[in-house]
């Protein structure tokens, strides 16, 4: 579906129908069975390929909940709720491929100040619900998934921070997979906080200026325990970074899809990974 939509989007006359094709619930209900068959085939191709070429760390900018709702004549609350349920599905698909790291961009620090207060309150309630579900989810415990929430968490209400603590404590001993949620997160703010940490340590005499290098900064980021992302996926047709993992994505590969996040399918994930596998990573060379 997404490939067909991408072709149609090249022509102005077909842009409206193409967007509908990529995101309509009606359209997806028609092709869902075909997509499941294609998904099985794509998964088989991926698992039979050289596993060392698969990404170890996938990061996703989950964009398009509101546009999904608007395009389907729904309230934005339903769009965010659908986005939450989609994340649970994607987690299963990623675990199914044995990808050890998944990081998602759930809420930016800019969203907190720029979105309507009632919408942010809905998001907070969904985060609390989702984090509490994670703490009890058999899938999380069977696969030994460690939950990690990063960002300027002091910006969040106490009730959200409490739910974060519950999910992290329930999974803190797990090491097989790591699921990182970026909440109240901003890439620039993360770098600023790392630099402040370096400056403080230097002022106290514990750090020489000559010892400040890439590793010194990386070790002070919110994501210091994670490898850099191999593949960054952004949904909903926007082709920008939006202040996400600015330091960590220096050599990541990017995949953009026109599909809104709630419409993202298993096949879309496999296409993104197949596209990644087909590339030759250069790491700046």
Q: What residue ranges belong to the model's regions?
A:
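Flexible, compositionally biased loop and terminal segments
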Residues: 1-285
């Amino acid at each position: 579906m997404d490939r067909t939509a991408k072709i149609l989007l090249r022509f102005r006359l077909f842009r409206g129908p193409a967007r509908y094709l990529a995101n309509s619930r009606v359209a997806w209900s028609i092709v869902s069975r075909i997509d499941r068959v294609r998904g099985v085939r794509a998964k088989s191709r991926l698992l039979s390929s050289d596993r060392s070429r698969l990404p170890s760390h996938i990061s996703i900018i989950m964009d398009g909940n509101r546009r999904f709702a608007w395009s389907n004549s729904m309230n934005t609350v339903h769009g965010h709720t659908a986005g939450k349920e989609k994340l649970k599905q994607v987690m299963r698909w990623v675990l199914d491929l044995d990808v050890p790291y998944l990081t998602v961009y759930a809420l930016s620090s800019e969203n907190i100040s720029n979105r309507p207060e009632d919408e942010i309150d809905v998001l907070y309630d969904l985060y609390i619900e989702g984090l509490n579900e994670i703490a009890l989810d058999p899938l999380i415990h069977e696969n030994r998934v460690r939950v990690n929430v990063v960002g300027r968490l002091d910006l969040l209400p106490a009730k959200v921070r409490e739910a974060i603590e519950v999910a992290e404590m329930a999974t803190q001993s797990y090491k097989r997979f790591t699921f990182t949620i970026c909440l109240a997160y901003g890439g620039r703010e993360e770098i600023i906080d790392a630099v402040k940490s370096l400056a403080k340590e230097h002022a106290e005499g514990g750090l020489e200026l000559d010892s400040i290098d890439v590793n010194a900064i990386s070790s002070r980021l919110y994501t210091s325990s994670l490898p850099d992302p191999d593949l960054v996926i952004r949904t909903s047709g926007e082709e920008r970074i939006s202040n996400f993992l600015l330091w960590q994505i220096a050599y990541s590969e990017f995949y953009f899809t026109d599909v809104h996040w709630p419409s993202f399918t298993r096949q879309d994930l496999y296409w993104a990974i197949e596209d990644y596998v087909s590339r030759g990573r250069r790491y700046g060379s």
